[in-house]
């Protein structure tokens, strides 16, 4: 077993305590945490009431004192005007604006469960999630209001954020409502988020106050975040990175959050430049797009720390980012919705680490192990499925017993190994391992070599059915702007670097690699593209 408290305890002071929860679950968490995320907001407001808490891309600015006032007003309105109560399931389908942040914190105060819905989904996809989540209320942007009219028992509140005052102020008598006492508690669920995948297979992940608080405290300790830090949120707030690793972390730490409704690389970089932003956390795809704007923003001296999660970051891209921002530390992160974001973090600056290609070591309060197909724990260097247990692991899946989470140990579905020093190397999703005639291929091995070829911006390798070998690897490639590379040139390069059976039998090009709503490469969709096109060719 690999214990985060031991591995990080050698590097930084860790004020950890052991707690037993009401369900008998034992966790190791940080001392003196507030009871709820709303309590974290109050603590930050008490320390720095006049500090900027949120500024959004509509020009609206809220200090911590003002943010508490707005959250209290909206929570009171939801209770008195809409009869909302603790435990109610409330859909949130808002873009990344001040309204989203205030609504989320108001729901935490009430003790309601925020069911965060992806704004990139289509109506049919949202329908499947709404039916599974047992929603009683929906708070949405007016762009989506009509989608919910067919649900007769669903109370709908819609808004369109705009320049000027909060749209919540248009609600009747919001100023006249009596302030309510906080209803939420440490162990209460606060969020339901859906895993990526097809809507029929998406799992509703239930996260509690203590999950969010531990995740925030761990990030703060590992990245040395203080109230002097600031972050722009370059990813949607319906993703766990946006909601926990950025919004939750900075409310907890008392820093400043810059919220954008939509991602545009130049807009994010201009915000960093003009607002002197110090921290950013994003997926590899975001960093790829930011690198394309390098020439417009050659120096960003305020940035001190970058984190990258969602999927593996290639060595070549890390080196490019270091060339661009040599003063800035870069840390890889491995986690998932079920871990409330953080699972492992590379403790040292990636460019200086001999473990640059790893995902780091377990965060304080988490324990990891590697097991074989029979559940037997494996030793360092042996490859198997990654399992994790600890304080920021979800309460469970909503209305689903998947068998993935038993005795507080979660099967991640990822294949990898640990070194003797406790560094985690994630090799592939278990379901994405390619079996070509009995020879196992990890897609990451092939992708890493593809990224060595100049001009390749993004690459995805998947397995598709083959009459003789069972499966064969194929590759989808996205080239950099104004670059031309042929499939023949790519194949010739791979022949020099890889065993013959690992070389993709087919290479296709695309203008944009398909992504899931959570910002990860959508290998299921890519596999479907190859299979369907192959069927068309045989007709």
What are these regions (language model features)?
Residues 68-76, 205-226, 234, 244, ...:
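Conserved structural elements of the adenylate-forming
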Residues 361-365, 376-407, 439-441:
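Conserved ATP/PPi-binding loop(s) of AMP-dependent carboxylate-activating enzymes
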Residues 280, 390, 396, 415-502, ...:
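AMP-binding/adenylate-forming catalytic core of the ANL superfamily
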Residues 49-50, 176-194, 200-201, 224-230:
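Conserved pre-ATP/AMP-binding loop-to-beta segment of ANL
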Residues 33, 42, 50-97, 101-105, ...:
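Conserved AMP-binding/adenylate-forming core of the ANL superfamily
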Residues 277-282, 292-354:
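Gly/Ser/Thr-rich phosphate-binding loop
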Residues 111, 213-230, 240-278, 293:
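Conserved AMP-binding/adenylation subdomain of ANL enzymes
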